[in-house]
């Protein structure tokens, strides 16, 4: 009950990396699926399958004539053996790719001898408990000032402690979001609290950035070198999306430098903007300033909606970090929902790709709890103070992380 557990279905089609066990006998050893997960004897290649087999320089079509544990015998259609086609026993592990494209059977033969079942990959994350606290003496709660105080949380009045309490609340709510972005799980024997339980209940929780780093994709492109280079690097991002879920609509949350680099890239492609004849908003009036700040655009078959990420720019948050090598410049997040199997509820359901899970019951909701103790107002203790407590228990669920992109 301390973890959120969900399962995501693997790819529909069967594709693997393989090593050529014996090219003269056309035997391949299956190593991993195309996402790098070890499969071995659990591969889905069956006798009768028609496949594509590729090396770095050649693709052949073949027929699977035999399967034994983690190996498959594949007979090429256009060659006597893969050896004669230029394949080598000395190629490294995973040097070849095998893709199942169909099947072929002789007249009057029996059907399949084995069935393929969907493969699911289970993921989990751990709730963490976050707390904060504000205290003011009973005497100070009675000090009325001459200037009205108004805070970001909507509090107002002539009591100065309202401002401090409101700031504490605002800071805590910011921490709730920042933790969901930045948190990571402690590894065994890590210096952080705990992390010594062999991974069963690691301390910490997997935030968005760690989820994308471990299960998603990363890019160092689109840095503003020049428009042509940025465009080529952006197209490389599209190629990665093509290989995965190909979610059409995506949100881009980026820092100022990356935002301007994307604007420059798009402006260079806009002949009107480059020629100075497009005046942007307000019915394209020539009396208005030229608008080169692009908030949404389409490239290939994808729509992107760009937004400046204040968290990455503000000197009070990540903008204060001096890391110029691995610092995060932005994140691309797919819009919409995905279908997953919730192992705790025992059913399939549609959830947003990115959402927060909280601990709650009919008697207690720990999404955001606030309570007051002390002797101010209704006394709950003998302490001459007013204590304001804040608590939340939550974790982030990043579904389909292979559709996310982190910009470093």
Language model features by range: what are they?
Residues 1-296, 302, 308-318, 322, ...:
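Flexible, glycine/threonine- and acidic-rich loop/arm segments that mediate assembly and lattice contacts
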Residues 326-327:
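Short, surface-exposed, low-complexity cationic segments
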């Amino acid at each position: 009950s301390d973890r959120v557990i969900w399962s995501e279905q693997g790819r529909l089609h069967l594709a693997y990396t393989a090593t050529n066990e014996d090219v003269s006998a056309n035997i391949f050893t299956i190593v991993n699926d195309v996402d790098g997960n070890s499969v071995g004897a659990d591969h889905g290649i069956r006798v009768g399958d028609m496949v594509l087999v590729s090396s770095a320089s050649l693709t052949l079509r073949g027929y699977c004539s035999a399967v034994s544990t983690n190996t498959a015998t594949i007979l090429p259609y256009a060659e006597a053996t893969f050896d004669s086609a230029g394949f080598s026993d000395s190629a490294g592990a995973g040097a070849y790719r095998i893709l199942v494209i169909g099947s072929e059977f002789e007249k009057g033969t029996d059907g399949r001898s084995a069935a393929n079942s969907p493969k699911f990959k289970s993921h989990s994350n751990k709730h963490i408990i976050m707390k904060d606290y504000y205290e003011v003496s009973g005497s100070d709660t009675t000090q009325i000032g001459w200037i009205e105080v108004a805070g970001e949380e909507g509090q107002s009045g002539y009591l100065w402690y309202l401002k401090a309490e409101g700031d504490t609340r605002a800071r805590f709510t910011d921490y709730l979001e920042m933790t969901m972005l930045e948190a990571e799980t402690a590894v065994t024997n890590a210096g952080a609290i705990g992390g010594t339980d062999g991974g069963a209940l690691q301390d910490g929780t997997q935030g968005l950035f760690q989820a994308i780093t471990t299960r998603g994709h990363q890019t160092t492109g689109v840095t503003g070198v020049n428009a042509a280079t940025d465009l080529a690097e952006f197209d490389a991002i599209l190629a990665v999306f093509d290989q995965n879920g190909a979610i059409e609509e995506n949100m881009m949350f980026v820092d100022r430098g990356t935002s301007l680099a994307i604007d420059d890239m798009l402006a260079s492609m806009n002949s009107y903007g480059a020629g100075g004849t497009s005046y942007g908003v307000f019915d394209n009036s020539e009396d208005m300033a030229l608008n080169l700040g692009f908030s949404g655009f389409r490239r290939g078959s994808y729509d992107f909606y760009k937004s400046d990420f204040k968290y990455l720019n503000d000197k009070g948050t990540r903008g204060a970090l001096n890391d110029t090598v691995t610092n995060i410049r932005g994140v691309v997040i797919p819009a919409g929902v995905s279908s997953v199997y919730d192992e705790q509820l025992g059913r399939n359901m549609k959830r947003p790709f990115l959402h927060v899970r909280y601990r709650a019951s009919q008697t207690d909701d720990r999404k955001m709890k606030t309570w007051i103790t002390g002797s101010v107002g209704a006394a709950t203790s003998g302490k001459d103070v007013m204590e304001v407590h804040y608590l939340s228990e939550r974790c982030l669920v990043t579904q389909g992380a292979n559709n996310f992109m982190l910009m470093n």
